[in-house]
Regions:
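RecB-family 4Fe-4S metal-dependent nuclease core
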Residues: 1-132
Length: 132
């Protein structure tokens, strides 16, 4: 039998926990990238370890591995669905690199939160036209 691995990303609080709905549109690429970086390993599930609550929350996993991720979890995917997520992740990365090279650092499709500690230096507002 092949060795099975669980990938764990530790977060201080549950605020850092992301799910598949944020991964598919490219808003959270970290967990898919972690799995992709371990192609030579049989990663059966990817979990967040929430330090403050001492809980583990499943983010992604192989649907057939129900001892590691519930089949009801939106992140429980069939092999082909995981491959598609990885393909989409690669496309998002290419798009982000192209934007960076073009000098586009916009935070689309989201807006900067009022509570963001970087909002004073972030380009979260539309460019203002100034008369010179």
């Amino acid at each position: 039998d092949e060795d099975k691995y669980i990938l764990i990303d530790y977060k201080n609080s549950s605020g850092g926990v992301k799910d598949i709905s944020q991964m598919e549109p490219g808003l959270s690429l970290q967990m898919p990238l972690y799995i992709m970086s371990q192609q030579d390993k049989n990663i059966v599930a990817a979990l967040y370890g929430v330090i403050s609550s001492k809980e583990f929350k499943a983010a992604l996993g192989k649907r057939k591995e129900t001892s590691f991720i519930s089949a009801r979890n939106k992140g429980a995917l069939y092999e082909e669905e995981l491959k598609e997520l990885f393909s989409i992740t690669k496309e998002h990365i290419k798009s982000y690199i192209a934007s960076i090279l073009a000098g586009d650092f916009s935070i689309k499709p989201k807006e900067c939160s009022n509570y963001c500690i970087y909002k004073d230096i972030c380009r979260y507002k539309d460019t203002l036209e100034v008369e010179v």
